């Protein structure tokens, strides 16, 4: 019974680590992924080693499977809380909605406005890049000012240039100056 509990706990730890390592790889953070992979591999070997010691012990196998499933749930939760990376929202509007554009820019979001031809009239599209950790804030602003907007989103693997890059460099310089002054 203690072995089954140990296997379950190891899986609860292992699978979220596996999830984080996978996300780091997808986000092109290979060195961090490799470091996390060391821990992941060690836990995997220990856990599976206990299961393979006695394949007739069905409690160990069930603990492994249930722990894996519970670990997936926990890994998904942790990933949402960490919100690693960036996201782009494309917001389609019937009018230019300067109020929304101004509020987004005032809040520190990079916004590009496009004018396009819809089936019956001119339409406007906003391309907004944000840290995933600020996605909720972004959606609250959009929903408050333009609740009927059509939105689609996708995650960004990498980017270069633009407002967001300048803002990040500016923040990094400010931190360096603050650090040297302290």
UniProtKB/Swiss-Prot annotation:
State the name under which the record lists this protein: UPF0316 protein BA_3420/GBAA_3420/BAS3170
Its membrane topology: Multi-pass membrane protein
Family annotation (NCBIfam families): PRK04164.1-4, PRK04164.1-5
Query: Where can this protein be found?
Result: Cell membrane
Q: Which UniProt keywords apply?
A: Cell membrane, Membrane, Transmembrane, Transmembrane helix
A cellular component term from Gene Ontology for this protein is: plasma membrane
Q: Which Pfam families match?
A: DUF2179, DUF5698
Any transmembrane segments, and where? 6-26, 32-52, 58-78
Family statement: Belongs to the UPF0316 family.
PANTHER family, A to Z: UPF0316 PROTEIN YEBE
**Organismal lineage:** Bacteria, Bacillati, Bacillota, Bacilli, Bacillales
């Amino acid at each position: 019974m203690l072995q089954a509990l140990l296997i379950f706990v190891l899986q609860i730890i292992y699978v979220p680590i596996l999830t984080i390592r996978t996300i780091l790889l997808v986000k092109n953070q290979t060195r961090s992924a490799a470091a996390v992979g060391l821990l992941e591999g060690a836990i995997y070997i220990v856990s599976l080693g206990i299961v393979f010691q006695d394949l007739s012990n069905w409690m160990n196998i069930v603990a492994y499977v249930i722990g894996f499933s519970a670990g997936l749930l926990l890994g998904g939760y942790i990933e949402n809380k960490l919100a690693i990376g960036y996201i782009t929202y494309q917001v389609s509007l019937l009018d230019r909605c300067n109020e929304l554009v101004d509020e987004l820019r005032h809040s520190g979001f990079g916004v590009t406005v496009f004018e396009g031809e819809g089936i019956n009239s001119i339409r406007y599209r906003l391309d907004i890049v944000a840290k995933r950790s600020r996605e909720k804030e972004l959606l609250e602003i959009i929903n408050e000012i333009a609740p009927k907007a059509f939105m689609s989103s996708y995650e960004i693997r990498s980017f270069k240039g633009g407002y967001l890059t300048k803002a990040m460099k500016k923040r990094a310089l400010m931190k360096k100056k603050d650090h040297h002054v302290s």
